[in-house]
Swiss-Prot record:
Its cofactor is pyridoxal 5'-phosphate. Acetylation, which is up-regulated by glucose and insulin and down-regulated by glucagon, inhibits the glycogen phosphorylase activity by promoting PPP1R3B-mediated recruitment of phosphatase PP1 and Ser-15 dephosphorylation. It catalyses: [(1->4)-alpha-D-glucosyl](n) + phosphate = [(1->4)-alpha-D-glucosyl](n-1) + alpha-D-glucose 1-phosphate. It comes from the Eukaryota. Its main location: cytoplasm. This is Glycogen phosphorylase, liver form. Allosterically regulated through the non-covalent binding of metabolites, being activated by AMP and inhibited by ATP, ADP, and glucose-6-phosphate. The activity is also controlled by post-translational modifications including phosphorylation and acetylation. The modification N6-succinyllysine is found at K364. Allosteric enzyme that catalyzes the rate-limiting step in glycogen catabolism, the phosphorolytic cleavage of glycogen to produce glucose-1-phosphate, and plays a central role in maintaining cellular and organismal glucose homeostasis. GO terms for cellular component: cytoplasm; cytosol; extracellular exosome; extracellular region; ficolin-1-rich granule lumen; secretory granule lumen.
Length: 847
């Protein structure tokens, strides 16, 4: 028997997702039955919940394929300029519900599954997250794909089909333990392998220079097998493609020097070639110069460029003159966006193809290459910038090293001509760093090889121009742009918060889903008490639902009427989960000191993964879980304060916690977070932000008014001034009694009685080498948190501020971001055209 419906679920029945036709439901039930029997070969006596999920996924997929084929035919017929988004990460999460929403099928599927006596939410929970990313960079790529399809751009996402995505995080005895994420174990109903487009990728070997040109010979070959996943736009019949490459050994791998005794070993060694796409490197904002990682970076680039050139040659623009293709139109037909420096090898690879294979003169090849590429910078942290050792590149990609040297020589010649005696500038701007062992600076390669370089929030783009790449922006100021990040409102509002999406639609109509700037219309409801109460009711329902989820999944009971104070993101020193933790201990101490004093109840929720080799991040998790143990088991504290470490934070968990959040923690040291996108998701879902003036927080404050965020702490100039003066942590420790108490407790084993010196590394870091100045912002942070508690006691004032934030969040749609890329970088036009589903064109398409 199905569960009774909540108010929110009842309201969903009169919904912007359209009225369900009876024939639709009957069709879906038929299709579901057909797939259960003929695709899964099961009947209801032996079918499991997972079988029912797969039957539903195949049913929904049936509605995608016609649109997918028609979209590709449409592109083949019309030959629009193509956009290629190259990324080593696509953090997609789950696909089923997003597809139903974008195709307008959710209500019909809901009804069909209900009539079959099943629970659609239970089926949705079966789907594995496609965790092919670490955090913000990979999730941004996923949001961008959704927006590009919704805007009708002829766009493709290209990446790697990792067999194992970001590890699953288990917390054992308070420590993070990593487990492999075998996300493909049960199969993936959304992908289609395309063995007919399999391509060779070369490694190692040597370079041969002859009169007729340059050849890269004696290489090892690995095959790249593409898997295509459909990317549906919202209600526009456009379905674009994400193509992910999987590594396969060629059939003669290690068997060319056939030797009877080695046959079995040669077959077993095929694994070595296929390891390239085995696992995602779990580093966020940290460069690890491993050979396998460099192989991954070249693998995706080499396969993708062959594919792009094949598609270009198949189009009417790929005309031939004599023996070769004319590539003059290439940059008018192809835009390639490099998502960070990970796919930077695309620049020398395209040069290799143009010069060595297509026999173009260097100057022509370079002109085409520069016009084709654009580069997005995502971080200013020095430890995150990619610098590959020259000897490794020479071993793995000898021809590419020669090309990089040639690019660098011509680049430096230009600098010498412009700044004749400035030797230091040459050193600073070279693609090759000579200090110590020689390294290639991949960011410099990207800047020199692209026609546009962008940061991802105004403040970040300013830092990029004035500090990190100052010399380059002085040389070519017009090359540098800002494109503030955004999030897709389909996943981050309609899907994760249907109650709020409905409430908004009732007031301002449904068009905001494709034009989020329309949320400004909500300003006219600021004085509407009934609407504010409805807004609060939606939040309360989300909090209840999340509380029930925590109880079921994590066996923790929380107070659903407490303030939900949430910080969920990768664990990193610069994101300052430690500052949050110090505040938690401060609140605990205040309750203990004066238990009768009024205290606004809080549930502090912290979640995120630490890179497996990042000792300090793992210690921070252990500190949080140790503090939680003490706080949650202290009877004097009761339900006033609870601390939850949210295990295995991922996209599907974000969709649950974000709509339930009251207070969003965005507390990185000013000048360290490039943009952040979690901050935007919380804002759109009716949480208030406590944050520093960093990343996109600055623009959020600009849009909503600084008085409608809880802004605290040092600004960029203050941080610079403190650096100049010299940061002395001890001064703050001695001046602030509450801080001193907290640090002493951590230091003397109050939270680790069995091992009093457990946290000595954290204490040592905080006092002697804290690059992110936690103590410097502690006092301002705690005072700001007191203001948060004050406001929370006044629901009307709180909800008014919430509404102001939601009404101001329209700028942060990834649709707006993508329109800006389209206009200012890619030179393509978004299209409102709803692709016709009739099959008037049956031409073979170029996929």
């Amino acid at each position: 028997m199905a569960k009774p419906l909540t108010d929110q679920e009842k309201r969903r029945q009169i919904s912007i997702r359209g009225i369900v036709g009876v024939e639709n439901v009957a069709e879906l039930k038929k299709s579901f039955n057909r797939h259960l029997h003929f695709t899964l070969v099961k009947d209801r006596n032996v079918a499991t919940t997972r079988d029912y999920y797969f039957a539903l996924a195949h049913t929904v997929r049936d509605h995608l394929v016609g649109r997918w084929i028609r979209t590709q035919q449409h592109y083949y017929d019309k030959c629009p300029k193509r956009v290629y988004y190259l990324s080593l990460e696509f953090y997609m999460g789950r696909t089923l519900q997003n597809t139903m929403i974008n195709l307008g099928l959710q209500n019909a599927c809901d009804e069909a599954i209900y009539q079959l006596g099943l629970d659609i939410e239970e089926l949705e929970e079966i789907e594995e997250d496609a965790g092919l990313g670490n955090g913000g960079l990979g999730r941004l790529a996923a949001c961008f794909l959704d927006s590009m399809a919704t805007l009708g751009l002829a766009a493709y996402g290209y990446g790697i089909r990792y067999e194992y995505g970001i590890f699953n995080q288990k917390i054992r005895d308070g420590w993070q333990v990593e487990e492999a994420d075998d996300w493909l174990r049960y199969g993936n109903p959304w992908e289609k392998s395309r063995p007919e487009f399999m391509l060779p990728v070369h490694f190692y070997g040597k370079v041969e220079h002859t009169n007729t040109g340059t050849k890269w010979i004696d290489t090892q070959v690995v095959l790249a097998l593409p898997y295509d996943t459909p990317v549906p736009g919202y209600m526009n019949n456009t379905v674009n493609t994400m193509r992910l490459w999987s590594a396969r050994a060629p059939n003669d791998f290690n068997l060319r020097d056939f030797n009877v005794g080695d046959y079995i070993q040669a077959v077993l060694d095929r694994n070595l070639a296929e390891n390239i796409s085995r696992v995602l490197y779990p580093n966020d904002n940290f460069f690890e110069g491993k050979e396998l990682r460099l192989k991954q970076e070249y693998f995706v680039v080499a396969a993708t460029l062959q594919d792009i050139i094949r598609r270009f040659k198949a189009s009417k623009f790929g005309s031939t003159r004599g023996a070769g293709t004319v590539f003059d139109a290439f940059p008018d037909q192809v835009a390639i966006q490099l998502n960070d420096t990970h796919p930077a090898l695309a620049i020398p690879e395209l040069m290799r193809i143009f010069v060595d294979i297509e026999k173009l003169p260097w100057s022509k090849a370079w002109e085409l290459t520069q016009k084709t590429f654009a580069y997005t910078n995502h971080t200013v942290l020095p430890e995150a910038l990619e610098r590959w050792p020259v000897d490794l590149v020479e071993k793995l990609l000898p021809r590419h090293l020669e090309i990089i040297y040639e690019i660098n020589q011509k680049h430096l010649d230009r600098i010498v001509a412009l700044f004749p005696k400035d030797v230091d500038r040459l050193r600073r701007m070279s693609l090759i760093e000579e200090e110590g062992s020689k390294r290639i600076n991949m960011a410099h390669l990207c800047i020199v090889g692209s026609h546009a370089v962008n940061g991802v929030a105004k403040i970040h783009s300013d830092i990029v121009k004035t500090k990190v790449f100052k010399d380059f922006s002085e040389l070519e100021p017009d090359k540098f742009q800002n494109k503030t990040n955004g999030i897709t409102p389909r996943r981050w509002l309609l899907l994760c918060n249907p109650g709020l999406a409905e409430l908004i639609a009732e007031k301002i109509g449904e068009d905001y889903v494709k034009d989020l700037s329309q949320l400004t219309k909500l300003h006219s409801f600021l004085g509407d008490d009934v609407f504010l109460r409805e807004l609060a009711k939606v939040k309360q329902e989300n909090k209840l639902k999340f509380s029930q989820f925590l109880e079921t999944e994590y066996k923790v009971k929380i107070n659903p009427s407490s303030m939900f104070d949430v910080q969920v993101k990768r664990i990193h020193e610069y994101k300052r989960q430690l500052l949050n933790c110090l505040h938690v201990i401060t609140m605990y101490n205040r309750i203990k000191k004066d238990p009768k004093k009024l205290f606004v109840p809080r549930t502090v929720i912290i979640g995120g993964k630490a890179a497996p080799g990042y000792h300090m991040a793992k210690m921070i998790i252990k500190l949080i879980t140790s503090v939680a143990d003490v706080v949650n088991n202290d009877p004097m504290v009761g339900s006033k304060l609870k601390v939850i470490f949210l295990e295995n934070y991922r996209v599907s968990l974000a969709e649950k916690v974000i709509p339930a959040t009251d207070l969003s923690e965005q507390i990185s040291t000013a000048g360290t977070e490039a943009s952040g996108t979690g901050n935007m998701k919380f804002m759109l879902n009716g949480a208030l932000t406590i944050g520093t003036m960093d990343g996109a927080n600055v623009e959020m404050a600009e849009e909503a008014g600084e008085e409608n965020l809880f802004i605290f702490g040092m600004r960029i100039d203050d941080v610079a001034a403190l650096d100049k003066k010299g940061y002395e942590a001890k001064e703050y420790y001695e001046a602030l009694p509450e801080l001193k108490l907290v640090i002493d407790q951590i230091d003397n084993g109050f939270f680790s009685p069995k091992q009093p010196d457990l946290f000595k590394d954290i204490i040592n870091m905080l006092f002697y080498h804290d690059r992110f100045k936690v103590f410097a912002d502690y006092e301002a942070y705690v005072k700001c948190q007191d203001k948060v508690s004050q406001l929370y006691m006044n629901p009307k004032a709180w909800n008014t501020m919430v509404l102001k934030n939601i009404a101001a969040s329209g700028k942060f749609s990834s649709d707006r971001t993508i329109k800006e890329y389209a206009q200012n970088i890619w030179n393509v036009e978004p299209s409102d055209l709803k692709i016709s589903l009739s099959n008037e064109s049956n031409k073979v398409n170029g996929n």
